[in-house]
Swiss-Prot record:
Its main location: cytoplasm. The gene is thrS. Its EC number is 6.1.1.3. It comes from the Bacteria. This is Threonine--tRNA ligase. Binds 1 zinc ion per subunit. Homodimer. Residues 234-548, 252-552 are annotated as: Catalytic. It is an enzyme of class 6 (ligase). It is found in: Cytoplasm. One of its GO terms (cellular component) is cytoplasm. SMART domains: tRNA_SAD. Belongs to the class-II aminoacyl-tRNA synthetase family. GO terms for molecular function: ATP binding; metal ion binding; threonine-tRNA ligase activity; tRNA binding.
Length: 659
């Protein structure tokens, strides 16, 4: 057989040759250093046979793909270590049943059904066993079995692997990887790829936690235990990640939401349904007020639509039944003699479309920008719900722009300006844009070819004019139009997808939307979907973690706490708090019978931006002693001076304090 090297040179090899044979043919240096290969653009290990005529580029430990290889093998090492862990506890290793063990971002996991529950306390012992397996430098071997042989290996022993074998299409190769010998090693059903031996795995890994995971993500299937690990090429990368992990725990919005009394998810109310507590609602209302001001200034018209709609509305839009799995079931009143069925609103767009369509529209009215803080409902599986970032009911800062094809670029520029204003106001400085365009080889897209080409060109031109750093992702467009979204890094360097802007040719067509053009003829408008925050719940969850609950003054639930030194200043403290409130600040006087230092500490724990201490001197002078969170004591100043500065900081939505 013939394969081709990166420089185009052919290499003759025996039939069934692997990348290992390529390395051997290229000399001792490559044979020693090679860990895998890129074969026709796909990641291979050294063990998988190469196709005839393949283009082969060998990989070493310096290549970024090495990380994928060793993380995958670490998942197998984890499974082997768990089996050995239970063998030493007196269990038959066969009693440990295995689900799947893939590579994930930063590491790996394995889903396991063990004879007794695993806990985080077991992880150091399992991790120690993994390190032993690395030191043994067990070579990996790949082999293929027939369907019957593969089923015989698992049937009656491991229902999860049996199910996976049965799902492999007829005629597709069923491969296994074995590390060590059959008796004391480990063999797993796997497509690969892997490192050549366990000794090639860098020792810079750590098991992080154990969590429950339903088999195949289905809450009606057995609950397995998912053991997570992280792994890196260098000790420095691992150290940095573990620091980030600890910092992320401190910033976890679920923990801070509880401690700062921002929100609540009550099981009696329902899973994934958020109760905003008074302090959390302040953050929500401030964000909405900011967005409302910006939208009105930019020519949006605010509308309100109901939380449910007729099933026919969503059949017309195509949201039902195509997305039925992510929706709550229809609401029926047939037993009351009413034929019409309803659906909890999964999207705001059909409602806005009906507002557009209630009368004839002229080109003079376009672009028409309709905006709403609309609450929608999606059915998320219980196991996938996560604090504010994955919920079943959420509010979107949703808007839909109806415009002519020629106006798409201008509207895109307007939305980009709004999104960038949001990012700047909240201190989100590190971001990049992605433009999703058609895959020219696919025929899944609706709409006119010329309109698509125009929209894609207009989006790229708008992104360039806005000075954005962007990439064009071929095939990332939705079937109904191209899009642009942002990937934003938070304070910990984690990436979040925000601020999607979507061009839509499909819904105007489905609803028969028209406008009368300059020529007196009817034309089809283009529709833009945009939501800079996206879900308010998710956005606030991200902000809580980005700021570590330490919000800038304009978002802080309590902006100032007045602390009297003793009982003698309590009336003055209340007077100061009253004046702050009258001026529009959120202020409280803390007159509890606690030591002054304890009250100051409590305000700091609650992350209140300003603590105003008042004693006899301050009372006599009409002043306050100002402490700014993270900056300490700023000295004494007249109350009027503090009020003027604090109001400026609040009204201008400053990130940094004025004092």
């Amino acid at each position: 057989m013939t394969v081709y090297l990166p420089d185009g040179k052919p290499l003759e090899l025996p039939e069934g040759a692997t990348a290992k044979d390529v390395a051997r043919a290229l000399g001792e240096g490559w044979e020693r250093r090679a860990v895998g290969a890129i074969v026709d653009g796909e990641l291979y290990d050294l063990l998988k046979p190469l196709p005839q005529g393949a283009k082969v580029r060998l990989l070493t430990e310096k290549d970024p793909e090495f990380q994928t290889l060793f993380r995958h093998t670490l998942a197998h090492v984890l499974a082997q270590a768990v089996k050995e862990f239970f063998r030493e506890k007196g269990y038959d290793p066969e009693s440990v049943r295995l689900g799947v063990g893939p590579v994930i971002e930063k590491g790996f996991y394995y889903d396991i059904e063990a004879p007794e529950p695993l806990s985080d306390e077991d992880l150091p012992a399992i991790e120690a066993k993994m390190r032993e397996i690395l030191k043994r430098d067990l070579p990996l071997r790949r082999f293929v079995l027939s369907r019957e042989e593969a089923l015989a290996r698992y049937r009656g022993k491991d229902p999860y692997k049996t199910e996976l074998v049965l799902e492999i299409p007829e005629g597709e190769e069923i491969s296994f990887y074995q590390q060590g010998d059959e008796a004391y090693g480990f063999t797993d059903l796997c497509r690969g790829p892997h490192v050549p031996s366990t000794g090639r795995i860098p020792p810079h890994f750590k098991l992080t936690h154990v969590a429950g995971a339903y088999w195949r993500g289905d809450e009606n299937r057995p609950m397995l235990q998912r053991v997570y690990g992280v792994a890196f090429r260098t000790a420095e990368e691992l150290k940095e990640y573990l620091w980030q992990l600890e910092e992320a725990k401190k910033r976890d919005h679920r923990r801070l939401g509880r401690e700062l009394e921002l929100f609540l998810i009550d099981p009696l109310v329902g899973k994934g349904l958020v109760l905003w507590l008074p302090k959390g609602n302040v953050v929500r209302e401030e964000l909405m007020a900011f967005m409302r001001e910006e939208q009105v200034r930019r020519g949006y018209q605010l509308v309100t639509t109901p939380h449910i709609g007729s099933l026919e509305l969503y059949k017309t839009s195509g949201h039902y039944p195509y997305y039925a799995e992510s929706q709550f079931p229809p609401i029926s009143f047939k037993e009351r003699g009413e034929e019409e069925e309803y659906l909890l609103k999964p999207m705001n767009c059909p409602h806005h479309i009906r507002i557009y369509a209630y009368r004839k529209r002229s080109y003079r009215e376009l672009p028409l920008r309709l905006a709403e803080f609309g609450t929608v409902y999606r059915y998320e599986k219980a196991g996938e719900l996560l604090g504010l970032t994955r919920v079943r009911g959420f509010t979107q800062d949703d808007a839909h722009i109806f415009c002519t094809p020629e106006e798409v670029k201008g509207e895109f520029l307007g939305v980009l300006d709004l999104v960038l204003k949001v990012f700047a106001t909240l201190g989100l400085k590190d971001y990049r844009a992605r433009i999703g365009v058609r895959d020219p080889k696919s025929d899944k897209y609706v709409g006119d070819e010329a309109k698509w080409a125009l929209a894609e060109r207009q989006i790229e031109e708008a992104a360039a004019e806005a000075g954005l750093r962007y990439t064009v992702e071929e095939g990332d467009a939705a079937f109904y139009g191209p899009k642009l979204d942002f990937v934003v890094k938070d304070a910990l360097g984690r990436e979040w997808q925000l601020g999607t802007i979507q061009v839509d040719y499909n819904l105007p067509e489905r609803f028969g939307l028209t406008y009368v053009g300059k020529d007196g003829e009817e034309h089809r408008p283009v529709m833009l979907h945009r939501a800079p925050f996206g879900s308010l719940e998710r956005f606030i969850g991200i902000l809580i973690e980005h700021f570590a609950g330490d919000f800038p003054l304009w978002l802080a639930p309590v902006q100032a706490v007045v602390v009297p030194v003793s009982e003698k200043q309590e009336d003055y403290a209340r007077e100061v708090a009253g004046r702050l409130k009258e001026a529009g600040l959120r202020a409280e006087a803390d007159t509890r019978p606690e030591r002054m230092q304890a009250r100051i500490r409590d305000a700091e724990v609650q992350k209140v931006p300003y603590i105003l201490v008042v004693g006899e001197r301050e009372k006599a002078e009409g002043a306050v002693s100002v402490r700014r969170r993270k900056k300490g004591n700023l000295g004494t100043m007249p109350l009027a001076a503090f009020l003027e500065g604090a109001l400026r900081e609040y009204r201008e939505r400053r990130l940094e304090p004025v004092f």
